[in-house]
């Protein structure tokens, strides 16, 4: 499996993955944030590729000097195989390269089900934030 930056040729595969994995409402919100993040800094959109297939995606952003994991999605058939963990690890490295000192999980009603996954990574309650103001990639 390879974790790499999103490329324009990945767009259809990523959109299909998000539609498959996320609820309709969540997918709509995520696609808007995804497009904005791509226009601002595509290096913070990562894909997990296995045998030429996109099996996971992570959308990160930097907002007010903090790094945020906004959305992570992994194909169901590839869950519990380290895909999400690898995406998070690679994003944390990207944040470190940019001198981001605090990395947070942007928590919203759509990713509450991921809490056990994040707990398995050793994250603490202080690593989660439900911003009172929407992140720039969400607010537009």
List each language-model region with its residue ranges.
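Conserved acetyl-CoA-binding loop of GNAT-fold acetyltransferases
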Residues: 118-128
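A short, internal acetyl-CoA/4′-phosphopantetheine-binding micro-motif in the GNAT/acyltransferase core
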Residues: 72-79
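Active-site rim helix/loop that mediates acceptor-substrate recognition in acyltransferases
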Residues: 25-47, 59
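Conserved beta-strand in the GNAT
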Residues: 47, 53-61, 68-70
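Conserved acetyl-CoA-binding loop-helix of GNAT-fold acetyltransferases
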Residues: 80-93, 120
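Conserved GNAT acetyl-CoA-binding A-motif
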Residues: 95-107
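Conserved beta-strand-loop-alpha-helix junction that forms the acyl-donor binding cleft
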Residues: 105-114, 132, 136
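A short beta-loop-alpha structural element at the N-terminal edge
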Residues: 1-14
């Amino acid at each position: 499996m390879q974790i790499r930056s999103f490329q324009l040729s990945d767009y259809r595969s990523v959109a299909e993955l998000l539609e498959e994995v996320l609820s309709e409402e969540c997918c709509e919100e995520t696609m808007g944030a995804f497009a904005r993040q791509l226009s601002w800094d595509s290096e913070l959109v990562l894909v997990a590729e296995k045998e030429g297939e996109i099996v996971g995606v992570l959308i990160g952003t930097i907002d007010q000097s903090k790094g945020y994991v906004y959305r992570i999605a992994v194909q169901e058939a590839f869950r519990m195989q380290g895909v999400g963990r690898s995406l998070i690890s690679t994003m944390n490295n990207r944040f470190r390269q940019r001198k981001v000192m605090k990395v947070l999980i942007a928590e919203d009603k759509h990713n509450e089900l991921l809490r056990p996954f994040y707990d398995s990574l050793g994250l603490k309650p202080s690593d989660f934030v439900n911003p009172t103001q929407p992140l720039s990639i969400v607010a537009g």
